[in-house]
Amino acid sequence: MSLSVGIVGLPNVGKSTTFNALTKAQNAQSANYPFCTIEPNRAMVEVPDLRLAELARTVKPERIMHSLIEFVDIAGLVKGASKGEGLGNKFLSNIRETEVILHIVRCFDEENITHVEGGINPLRDVEIINTELILADIEQLNKKIEKLSKEAKANQKGAKENLELANSLLAHLNKGLSASSYPEKESQSYQALIKELRLLSAKEVIYGANVDEKGISEDNDYVKALKEYAKKNKHEVIKLCAKIEEELVGLSDEESHEFLSSLGVSESGLNQIIRTAFAKLGLISYFTAGVLEVRSWTIKKGWKAPKAASVIHNDFEKGFIKAEVISYEDYVNYKGENGAKEAGKLRLEGKDYIVLDGDVIHFRFNV
């Protein structure tokens, strides 16, 4: 499943540092000058899930395998990116290939770290990026309208209706509003248009408020302003300190927990971001549990059992017979498959069963 999260923001706001912390490696170049990242860095990142550890305590497998999500570190955008400034066209194209945007916003003062706009103002920074995304969408939509106009004149099926929708959406964008706030965004025709054009401002957005160490336990004024803005626009803000997240890379889970506790927080901002991005992509996890491995498998919410089985192997879908299903809670509470079975908690589900997040499944198949 090639779904990914694009990390964007102005230059020098902490994108590459965040990416390095996400991947637990020094993959992305990070420096105190604009455009130190040009080609996008890509990495598969484990999705933190405490349920795997609980399952492992019951099964005692040889290994634990987490679900994965792809993050893409995209070079810093600047004002005028939609017109090609700062290699903007290339970078906007990189964003178009992703499904969710993680927008890193600088929310701390530090004289030794330059800011491309000369000073710290999170809302200004957010609007710069949003404006560039909208302008790029307007250009994309104008090209589509030109094509639809010709098709409508030729009386091609559906062209007039699609042209009307495209013009309505264009008027919306020209007001400086994002495609994600379009009133008719739930309509099938809108969804089809968005899928075709991959409009940037239609994507789900998570704001990563990059703070200094002092801002971790208590929101500073920058974070408060960003949260108020995001709430109005129905987006989420997750606070992180990219510098500290990078320092956590070399620590064990126990050491990380102690370090974070000393700062007054229970969980790293990056873990929250990963889980939120996973949900924004419409993904859930089901589990397989055996002595060789306990594993989390990634599927789209709403998938039926045969389709869910295909992520293990295509033969599982082709030869699907039944799915033996135990809920995560029952699996843990009754100490594994045998206990759950004795308690009557194991269910046999057919091809129309919609897999739920946290299901522990054994597939029966024949090929």
Question: What are the roles of these predicted feature ranges?
Answer:
Residues 2-8, 13, 19, 147-354, ...:
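C-terminal-of-GTPase-core extension/linker across diverse P-loop GTPases
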Residues 43-48, 75-85, 96-159, 172-186, ...:
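Conserved Switch II/interswitch segment of TRAFAC-class P-loop GTPases
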Residues 22, 84-87, 116-119, 220-224, ...:
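Short, glycine/charged-enriched secondary-structure capping and boundary segments
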Residues 25-33, 40-42, 50, 54, ...:
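Residue-level signal for pocket-adjacent positions within structured domains
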Residues 35, 49-52, 65-71, 85-99, ...:
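Amphipathic alpha-helical transducer elements in NTP-driven molecular machines
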Residues 59, 129-133, 242:
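A ubiquitous short alpha-helical element
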Residues 1-114, 148:
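Conserved G1/Walker A P-loop phosphate-binding module
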